[in-house]
Amino acid sequence: LFIYGVNVKKRILSGIQPSGELHLGNYFGMMSRMIEYQEKNDLFCCIVNLHALTTIDDKSILSKNTVNAAIDFIALGLDPKKTTFWIQGDVPQVCQSTWLFSNITNMGLLDRSTSYKDKIAKGLKPNVGLYSYPILMASDILLYGAHIVPVGKDQKQHIEIARDIAIRFNKIYGETFVLPEPSIEKNNRLVPGIDGNKMSKSYKNTIPIFGSEKIIRKRFMSILTDSADINEPKDIDSPLFKLFSLFLNQSEIDELKDRFLAPGMRYGDVK
């Protein structure tokens, strides 16, 4: 799929799990950036349905989610004429390379995965698929010769693992894979869920993009806040403030901050 050194233009790669309905974390964490990148870059974007197997074991649900994710992504602005867009599981070489990479990856590299430890702490069932998740992600990245992988700060370690695997493979078999670089925007913010943790379907704390008015309203009204009195300053580090800020420009964020710190406002007014 990729021949070392042939590509001149920098290739950007990103993917999204079809774990359920798309939410604000998907859009502000990755999708909005991809829609912007497709205008001037060699963008590769895929629906990573194999990764979703760590949380979904119902074939019909996964199939439905995969199709819906592709439809929703296009509805939000991804243009297949400007982007290489595909379903991860449709390329068997991904699994083949994952097995090859597994045999040159030291256990210690995976043992240090903070993402795995965090997911287990949040209640996800530990299994080999979840543990070896970074190797499958490395296949996604290396197989397509990605130079740049936009990620949040919490995903940077996965790119570092992919680099380590590429370096070891190249050392054993000769120069084959590009060494990918993570791209973390300086203003990139972790999108909080309604409970204050990272918004994730795994944590059941999401706000859907295409949900009904009733569902979206219920989720917003459930956003975690403290018990500050109406005349007390409100917490600008709260998930409510951070979520609201995603929809605002800097001057509007400053105005919202003033409202939070001034007396007379209730959290319910913002919701």
Give the positions of each predicted feature.
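Conserved nucleotide- and phosphate/pyrophosphate-binding catalytic cores
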Residues: 26, 157, 163-271
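Short, Lys/Arg-enriched N-terminal segments with co-localized hydrophobic residues
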Residues: 1-7
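N-terminal Rossmann-like or analogous alpha/beta NTP/dinucleotide-binding catalytic cores
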Residues: 10-139
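Divalent metal-coordination and catalytic microenvironments
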Residues: 73, 101, 154, 196, ...
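Short catalytic-loop micro-motif centered on adjacent basic/acidic residues
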Residues: 84-87, 150, 228
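Internal, conserved structured core segments that host functional sites
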Residues: 118-169
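Short helix-capping/linker segments at secondary-structure and domain boundaries
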Residues: 107-111, 143-150, 248-256
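Short, polar/flexible loop-turn hinges at active-site or ligand-entry regions and domain interfaces
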Residues: 59, 148-152, 176
